[in-house]
Amino acid sequence: LAFTGHKGLRGPQGTGGFLVSQELAEQMEPLISGGTGSVSHTEEIPNFMPDRFESGTPNLPGIYGLHEALLYLKTHSLQAINEKELSLTGYFLEQLQALDDTGRHIRIIGKKDLTDRNAVVSIQTPEIDMSQVAWQLDNEYGVMTRVGLHCAPNAHKTLGTYPAGTIRFSFGPENTKNELDFAIQGLKKILDL
């Protein structure tokens, strides 16, 4: 099982890990070789865990940040976090549809309700370059989004959003409806709706 630390676990970018049985670990070859600090007198990668798969200087600030993120998740209800995020997502979808019920100016990617959704809403703005919209949201309204293909060009081909990609909004439990309203107002002004 391989995982990234910066998505659902809420840790810093550049963190992650994997769980593997001892038997499988002995069969696997490391992808990267180099010093580990534990067996410095040889150029060979150690055979023991975790050093076998951890070349170079460990990302201690990242590991500490991931640890703190896991402690946060341990002390907060995952169900409550999920409910808050989905509530915000539903609200944002409603506001987008109220802003442009024709879908001519804003194309919502995926279902327009919470069925099979997580706390992410991707849109396209067919009449205005999406990079420009994302730039204006950030620089004029302080609304951070992600624009483009999101490291997943094949997913965008499947969705019919390739090669332009989308503008992606994602919500966390710290976000508020007021912040979402601010993003909607920014879109309204930028798209001249």
Predicted regions and their residues:
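Pyridoxal 5′-phosphate
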Residues: 1-193
